[in-house]
Amino acid sequence: MPSIKSDIEIARAAAKKPIFEIGAKLGIPVEQLVPYGHDKAKVSAEFIAAQAGKKDGKLILVTAINPTPAGEGKTTTTVGLGDGLNRIGKKAVVCIREASLGPCFGVKGGAAGGGYAQVVPMEDINLHFTGDFHAITSAHNLLAAMIDNHIYWGNEENIDIRRITWRRVMDMNDRALRSMVLSLGGVANGFPRQGGFDITVASEVMAILCLATDLKDLERRLGDIIIGYRFDRTPVHARDLKADGAMAVLLKDAMQPNLVQTLENNPAFVHGGPFANIAHGCNSVTATKTALKLGDYVVTEAGFGADLGAEKFFDIKCRKAGLKPDAAVIVATVRALKMNGGVKKDDLGTEDVAALKKGCANLGRHVANVRRFGVPVVVAINHFVSDTDAEIAAVKEFVSRLGAEAILCRHWALGSAGIEDLAHKVVELAESGQAKFQPLYGDDLSLFEKIEIVASKIYHAGEVTADKAVRDQLQTWEEQGYGKLPICMAKTQYSFSTDPNLRGAPEGHIVTVREVRLSAGAGFVVAITGEIMTMPGLPKSPSAERIFLNDQGYIEGLF
């Protein structure tokens, strides 16, 4: 039996075309591409602005059930579906997020897809790429430096150092940096205070970059950032410290979407990368809107399960950007359904139809949740070699009883040839006119009511609890004019509840909001639940231990 090639071996063997040829497929002139080598480029802001009057293509969201720690192949399916649509004669563009170094060297791996459904150059995309994350990290930390510098030179704004909310960021999983004391070492180093680091993908600057529509909107949003509070409890904004202009300068190039290609030489935008468990989990509005002007179909993803990424895609990204999705694909795997049915991780390779049927309740809820937004749904069964015919048949039967269709997809092994059936179904749904998109809640409800609606309607929680301090903070923000903002729930990706070990489709559980954060620049309020950390840690055996350069100088172990 021939050995199975690794993702990196497949990517390295790709017959890539020059990036100018990929741009030409979308009608992008050579002079409007800013090349980063031969196989990646940024699309100029000038070209993007010129597309404003064009008709939009169809928008397809790829989401998933609650995942296993390794993920269920959502990006792989997004890329595969884009290739599949092109294979059946549709002009399709893929839009995905950039990879964070934290997961690359941690547990989950990269974010370029897998098998024969990848975007390339895979190594570049998963590592430094075009420097967007560096720019975001730099802009965020410039503001942090200017806060402490302002205090050092007299604190004209009367910032209460006990109430500074702006932390520092870096693009790595490092639990040692979560909480620390800054400015130690004497008078010359400033005023000691408590601080810490978050991961770059949790930065409000990342969210702002992904929600801003142009450079002017970007600078306005950066100025709106609240960095902390004065002694009189009034908010201090980034523009009060005159930081917004310099931050925008650092982000000028990062605002331009990155164009790459799939293994089958189809265009893909890879831009922005907020996590979906601690941020809004979608690629940039700029990339998505540009792709909609250039392609007949745009296939995009939202992070983790539909309870997180899809809800935020609908309630934050689509609401803010005026997007209206035409269809949604929910990625399910036999192994994740079995895990949701109670099977232990080490036993997922063994057939267990009974556990799978039990775990299908998780899939059923995700289907119902997406339909709640008025978007038609198809289920993609991302095939693994350990799947049995009986297990696949059980999933198809369950989904058919919901009035939907589950389609087996082999894009990981076969590329676009393995996902044609799904591509045809997506076209059927998108062209049917069934989509009647609407957000889950209205702008005028109170912030706490919005949290309760997400918790009850999407998570099926029985109650939402929060300390008086949390409720008072929400009320204060409403009084300051932030009451119309949407909610961004920070929650475990492994369960509908706030307990990562509570699998399946739990009912009546309690959602406790332990902290709320106002992202005034991004335009949402973050409600933090459970044990979610905005700076992750590495696992006991991180994937970094297995990544190295071989004798030829090639990277091994990246996935």
Swiss-Prot record:
ATP binds at T68, P69, A70, G71, E72, G73, K74, T75. Pfam families: FTHFS (PF01268). InterPro entries: Formate_THF_ligase (IPR000559), Formate_THF_ligase_CS (IPR020628), P-loop_NTPase (IPR027417). SUPFAM superfamilies: P-loop containing nucleoside triphosphate hydrolases. Pathway: One-carbon metabolism; tetrahydrofolate interconversion. Keywords: ATP-binding, Ligase, Nucleotide-binding, One-carbon metabolism. One of its GO terms (molecular function) is formate-tetrahydrofolate ligase activity. GO terms for biological process: tetrahydrofolate interconversion. It is an enzyme of class 6 (ligase). It catalyses: (6S)-5,6,7,8-tetrahydrofolate + formate + ATP = (6R)-10-formyltetrahydrofolate + ADP + phosphate. Its EC number is 6.3.4.3. Belongs to the formate--tetrahydrofolate ligase family. This is Formate--tetrahydrofolate ligase.
